[in-house]
Amino acid sequence: MATDVVFDTSMGSFTVELYNEHAPKTCRNFATLAQRGYYNNVIFHRIIPNFMVQTGDPTGTGRGGSSIYGEKFEDEIHPGLKHTGAGVLSMANSGPNTNGSQFFITLAPTPWLDGKHTIFGRVKSGMRVIQRMGLVKTNSEDRPVDEVKIIRAKVVEEGDE
């Protein structure tokens, strides 16, 4: 059974498909946070063209956020999953085993992140929205000048019709 999360943002909607079998703990954390409304009204605090868009921190600083397991939880690095191109859904962290609520979506191949960040899904639809986000004007700290934010995140279980 596949789990999708639909994000309505200030720039349009996109859907991610979660890799429950490769990163079960990470996917459970992400889906539960989305279900609880944790990501609603959260900004994309870091956008780097041709690299990635990052969000998931309710403080909007890039230093906040926590998981459903408490503070931080361990990586689930799967050798078969690589940051091979645009649309990879991966956990942001501050070193090994420091996953919380922040995540990013790649805009290009980022092989230097392989083995360092937990890949737990991919963009299933709405990649154009992500690509447009990657083009917004940012300041010297990679923060969008005009706010880009998640309006609402909604979990959709396939086969729930």
UniProtKB/Swiss-Prot annotation:
Disulfide bonds: none annotated. One of its GO terms (molecular function) is peptidyl-prolyl cis-trans isomerase activity. The keyword Mitochondrion does not apply. It holds the Pfam family Pro_isomerase. Keywords: Isomerase, Rotamase. Residues 1-155 form the PPIase cyclophilin-type domain. The keyword Isomerase applies. It comes from the Eukaryota. SUPFAM superfamilies: Cyclophilin-like (SSF50891). It catalyses: [protein]-peptidylproline (omega=180) = [protein]-peptidylproline (omega=0). Its EC number is 5.2.1.8. GO terms for biological process: mRNA splicing, via spliceosome; protein folding. One of its GO terms (cellular component) is catalytic step 2 spliceosome. PROSITE patterns: CSA_PPIASE_1 (PS00170), CSA_PPIASE_2 (PS50072). Belongs to the cyclophilin-type PPIase family. PPIL1 subfamily. PANTHER family: PEPTIDYL-PROLYL CIS-TRANS ISOMERASE-RELATED, PEPTIDYLPROLYL ISOMERASE DOMAIN AND WD REPEAT-CONTAINING PROTEIN 1. PPIases accelerate the folding of proteins. It catalyzes the cis-trans isomerization of proline imidic peptide bonds in oligopeptides. This is Peptidyl-prolyl cis-trans isomerase-like 1. It comes from Aspergillus fumigatus (strain ATCC MYA-4609 / CBS 101355 / FGSC A1100 / Af293) (Neosartorya fumigata).
